[in-house]
Amino acid sequence: MRVLETIAVLREYRKSLKESVGFVPTMGALHRGHQSLIERSLKENSHTIVSVFVNPTQFGANEDFSAYPRPLEKDLALCEKLGVSAVFVPKVSEMYPYEIEQRLKLYAPTFLSHSLEGAVRHGHFDGVVQVVLRLFHLVNPTRAYFGKKDAQQLLIIEHLVKDLLLDIEIAPCEIARDSDHLALSSRNVYLNATERKQALAIPKALENIKQAIDKGEKACEKLKKLGLEILETLEVDYLEFCNHKLEPLKTIEPANTLVLVAARVGKTRLLDNLWV
């Protein structure tokens, strides 16, 4: 496995690859959710490149960039064990050669980025677009793999690829869950045992909503009430029913409905969703 620290080395390496290239962009602190993305890429491509880069432009004013976990040696060991071809680990100065005031400004599309997570984390998705577009330009993958857990991010990246006419296939990957059904997240490590049990209300609420839909309930207001009753012990930021343009729905639309939830358990903010 190659560890690529500079853009020049990455470009030289990329030129040597003649067959399909799968790409899994990450901020490190890899868990089994990331592992499932990597494993799918390994199955579907001749080569797999993983990036590990904690992107400063997607951190808000109240989010501590310096405190984000960076267990690089552990991440590299996992990638090597899985059979990854190369890991790109650039410094911030490599990815952003200019200071903020000199940088080309890129913005996520407003209709997808200003609600839900965008309403809470102002500018977050602009930062995501900044780094993902740079990584796509450098890696030039055949396919890129993103988890459905970050649904809003996934929709924005799919829109980005289509809008900028990029020849990259975006591969959405199912949400990876622990045995207790909690969605895998690097934030889960901040939960103590009591909070962990409380957090299980999130997947339970989504499962109960799914069961109600399967039984024929289509009214989003009724389904939302059902979910909020289960989430009542948590501090809920939102429980919303939207289509794939993130427009609010009153009635379930098969194959075009997202149920999105964000809730705080203690000091930890967790996301989960259901694709209907």
From Swiss-Prot:
Assigned keywords, A-Z: ATP-binding, Cytoplasm, Ligase, Nucleotide-binding, Pantothenate biosynthesis
EC number: 6.3.2.1
Binding, beta-alanine: 58
UniProt xrefs under InterPro entries: Cyt_trans-like, Pantoate_ligase, Pantoate_ligase_C, Rossmann-like_a/b/a_fold
One GO MF term attached to the UniProt entry: pantoate-beta-alanine ligase activity
Residues reported in the UniProt entry to bind ATP: 27-34, 147-150, 176, 184-187
Catalytic activity field: (R)-pantoate + beta-alanine + ATP = (R)-pantothenate + AMP + diphosphate + H(+)
SUPFAM superfamilies the record matches: Nucleotidylyl transferase
Binding site for (R)-pantoate: 58, 153
CDD domains: PanC
GO CC list: cytosol
Alphabetical list of Pfam families matching this protein: Pantoate_ligase
Enzyme class: ligase
Top-rank lineage group of the source organism: Bacteria
Pathway the protein contributes to: Cofactor biosynthesis; (R)-pantothenate biosynthesis; (R)-pantothenate from (R)-pantoate and beta-alanine: step 1/1
Subcellular location(s) of the protein: Cytoplasm
Residues annotated as the enzyme's active site: 34 (proton donor)
GO BP field: pantothenate biosynthetic process
Main location: cytoplasm
Subunit structure: Homodimer.
Other known facts: The reaction proceeds by a bi uni uni bi ping pong mechanism.
Family the UniProt entry places it in: Belongs to the pantothenate synthetase family.
Role description: Catalyzes the condensation of pantoate with beta-alanine in an ATP-dependent reaction via a pantoyl-adenylate intermediate.
Name of protein: Pantothenate synthetase
Native source organism of the sequence: Helicobacter pylori (strain P12)
